[in-house]
Amino acid sequence: MSLQSRLSGRLAQLRAAGQLLVPPRPRPGHLAGATRTRSSTCGPPAFLGVFGRRARTSAGVGAWGAAAVGRTAGVRTWAPLAMAAKVDLSTSTDWKEAKSFLKGLSDKQREEHYFCKDFVRLKKIPTWKEMAKGVAVKVEEPRYKKDKQLNEKISLLRSDITKLEVDAIVNAANSSLLGGGGVDGCIHRAAGPLLTDECRTLQSCKTGKAKITGGYRLPAKYVIHTVGPIAYGEPSASQAAELRSCYLSSLDLLLEHRLRSVAFPCISTGVFGYPCEAAAEIVLATLREWLEQHKDKVDRLIICVFLEKDEDIYRSRLPHYFPVA
């Protein structure tokens, strides 16, 4: 077998194995008539003549070209693959880098960065449909009709909202968005300083409005910050409208970012002084009416309370807005 035949056979083997990156350089004098040329671009040399014709693929792509196509298409090459640098959220000072890094992770990979290990998955949170089986409250004339599907979209939970693994949690913030007391401070401490760094770029928030940030070290992917009204004593009509707007503005962001689960704390009922019973009526009416319009766009709306008295209030009022079907 001639040297030319042996080289051609070896080239075919290398191409089949996906290991051909550059064409072999023939030794002088062994391939009579082979002419070495260089293309007009900055590309690699091409080998013409009998050797060059035999080295071409059926599609007319030369040996080097086939290797280049392989690299472009992601076929095996010897070039090392670029790997995204891992970010340590406990020490990082770049919120943009950290936020981008987290977006590229799967749900399972994100767990490594949670501030807690005892987080609560969405599937572990019972729906109102499940919870209502043990509710003794009977409503003779509920305000709304029975709807099994809506009862599967709403939940009441007494828990630490910072530990919920949902798409977003809502923060009852102050207008600065830089952290404060109550649930606001808890969320900022759990998420870490990167949350405050991103909030600083939002330049405050008006009462009744909402803004969204990453969740960072929280199990929740996002935090929706809203500012409730300050209402000591009997709330005015405008304050009631502002509280309703807090929930609607937060839900608007949920849809805008295509998120499907969200947990709300009790907004304005802490240091802002809004009466718990009056707030519950607004919250339940707002969520019920919103779900009637958008039930196919979300999986769960969670009312997450921290105090037993708030749980009792919502448990007694839920049947009026979400009658047991």
Swiss-Prot record:
Changing residue 160 to A: Reduced enzyme activity. Induction: Overexpressed by estrogens in breast cancer MCF-7 cells, probably via an activation of nuclear receptors for steroids (ESR1 but not ESR2). Significantly increased by estrogens in ESR1-positive Ishikawa endometrial cancer cells. Up-regulated in 17-beta-estradiol-responsive BG-1 ovarian cancer cells but down-regulated in estrogen-resistant SKOV3 ovarian cancer cells. Induced by androgen. Residues 141-322 form the Macro domain. Keywords: Acetylation, Chromosomal rearrangement, DNA damage, Hydrolase, Isopeptide bond, Nucleus, Ubl conjugation. GO terms for cellular component: mitochondrion; nucleoplasm; nucleus. It comes from Homo sapiens. Overexpression may promote MCF-7 cells proliferation. There is an approximate one-third increase of the invasive capacity of MACROD1-overexpressing cells. The expression of CDH1 is repressed by MACROD1. Further analysis demonstrates that MACROD1 inhibits CDH1 transactivation in a dose-dependent manner. Inhibition is abolished by estrogen deprivation, indicating that the down-regulation of CDH1 transcription by MACROD1 requires ESR1 mediation. Binding of ESR1 to the CDH1 promoter is antagonized by MACROD1, suggesting that MACROD1 could interfere with ESR1-mediated transcription. PANTHER family: ADP-RIBOSE GLYCOHYDROLASE MACROD1 (PTHR11106:SF93), GANGLIOSIDE INDUCED DIFFERENTIATION ASSOCIATED PROTEIN 2-RELATED (PTHR11106). Changing residue 188 to A: Reduced enzyme activity. This is ADP-ribose glycohydrolase MACROD1.
